Amino acid sequence: MKKFDEYPILAVTSDDESYPFGMRKMSNNSVIYYKGDISLINATKNIAVIGTRKISDRGRKLAYETGCILAKRKITLVNGLALGCDAEAIKGALSEGGKCIAVMPCGLEQVQPRLNYRLAEQILEKGGCMISEYPVGSSIQKYRYVERDKVQSEISQGIMIIEADENSGTMHTAEFAMRQHKRLACYYHKMIELSNGNLLLENSGKAKVIKTQSDLEEFIDIVGEEKEFQQLTLL
């Protein structure tokens, strides 16, 4: 079993065919660093599954089950490997043999958060990928989390929000998704303490509200049918 440190850190430039299509179109960064199979980004449909670190019991269940469903549908899961919703979604996807892409806000010689070190190894073991805009030695800075949130949207065709506070990093990704004309969805929650961001999106009419598994399946179908880089009309 390979350890995280045994996977080489490689780089790809914007003139290489394996450079993420979405970032070529929307990002000013000409170099991306990665571990694992970067071709995965362009080869599959990707949905970012994101949410709060302070996850509720219901949010934990929804994140895990969403990851499972995406894996069964052969959709690659994208997020920032954060504690809470991100990690649970990854665990669900990996449990069904799915592929995951984790976007780091730092150099790839480290895993952020450190608590998800083993989960990062599992992503790579299962044929997934970890990417970063930052070279080895780049420290963790607050603004880099916001830039990471932008990348999550750039490399995804759809964004699914499990539960989020309205002032969270998750909502940064939602805002980027709207600017980039990406498909956006969020789960409906009766209890809004940890999900007032979901309520904000629901009331805005700019996200598909997921109340049932059939709603989720419909969202996946819509994302799966989209042509690459088509300018999308928000749901």
Please annotate each region the language model reported:
Residues K2-L235:
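Glycine-biased, small-residue-rich flexible motifs in mid-sequence functional cores and linkers
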